[in-house]
Amino acid sequence: MRVILSGGGTGGHIYPAISIANKIKEQHPKAEILFIGTENGMESEIVPKAGYPIKYVTVSYLKRKISLHNVKSAAMLLKGIAEARKIIKEFKPDIVIGTGGFVCGPVLYMASKLGIRTMIHEQNVFPGLTNRILDRYVDRIALSFKDAEKYFKHKNKLVVTGNPIRSDFMEVTEVEASARYKTDSDLPLVLVVGGSGGALKINRAVVEILNQYQPNKYRLLLVTGKRLYKSTLESINAESLQSKHKVFAYVNDMPHALKACDLIVCSAGAITIAEVTAVGKASILIPKAHTAENHQEYNANAMGNKGAAVVIREDELSGEILNKKIQDIIGNIQVVKKMEAASYKEGIRDAADRIYSEMQALLERK
């Protein structure tokens, strides 16, 4: 089996592709897998570290308005299509899978024109521009959220698979998680995470909670992100950081921290939501503003509408508001249980298996 995977720009596009590659290797150890990305995207570092070869094509993002930049981008796109054609013809894949980002455009388009089986995976509720364009060309469209169905025209191509995540999120037990994070207090644990790079506004809201409200009805475990750790820690009054509250730059055992918490406060990236719902945790989602096509707000609202999360817009966030929302949830065990049940219902714990099955079905189709 020979497979090309293409996805890039951000971790949200790259990690699902790596999960799919790992599942293929698990089922077919001799499978030949090649990634196609861009040299200036995160994939140029992440993919080789994961142990997979990668080749690069030329691509540039498009602005929503007519501009000189778009003229240049169109020229680069034509070059990228030619480069993708050369790579695909040399590698001779059985199937080409795209996981989003502008790099998928030339790769999946050319694969479809060459008569090769194609599939794209969409991580967010509101699909990215590239995947919306590829809708007409590809054979199958795998969705992480059922709510995304309404944004695609070719309904017969759609299948809800979920977003693949690390298996250890499902493997960690409550006992193991509690042994690491609930040894020194019986108070409810609130995990606050702003994503791999941290979230400045979320960190500031938690600092405000610690300095002004000094909560004693719950414990805070704040993961600031390495870049924001020092400045965040320096903003917290010494007396506010009681022994029951913890501040870390990063945690290496997120599956344990997530399993141990009673409530998680986080941004609304697709992978984060997939992890939270896989273990069925109640959440307060704070979608990051100014993301591509505001996709985090769509993700957050989908969870909020199903009762799995409470949503706070980033421009409305403050320590006072966050503290009140935390207490409203944590203070009512029935609310927590109801949110946990809704969250677990939305979780898809076998996403990689589902995507692999769809890939196999495409390959077996005559």
UniProtKB/Swiss-Prot annotation:
Record's keyword terms, sorted: Cell cycle, Cell division, Cell membrane, Cell shape, Cell wall biogenesis/degradation, Glycosyltransferase, Membrane, Peptidoglycan synthesis, Transferase
Localization of this protein: Cell membrane
Organism domain of life: Bacteria
GO biological process: carbohydrate metabolic process; cell division; cell wall organization; lipid glycosylation; peptidoglycan biosynthetic process; regulation of cell shape
CDD domains: GT28_MurG (cd03785)
Pathway recorded for this protein: Cell wall biogenesis; peptidoglycan biosynthesis
Role according to the record: Cell wall formation. Catalyzes the transfer of a GlcNAc subunit on undecaprenyl-pyrophosphoryl-MurNAc-pentapeptide (lipid intermediate I) to form undecaprenyl-pyrophosphoryl-MurNAc-(pentapeptide)GlcNAc (lipid intermediate II).
Protein name (database record): UDP-N-acetylglucosamine--N-acetylmuramyl-(pentapeptide) pyrophosphoryl-undecaprenol N-acetylglucosamine transferase
Organism: Alkaliphilus oremlandii (strain OhILAs) (Clostridium oremlandii (strain OhILAs))
Name of the gene this protein is made from: murG
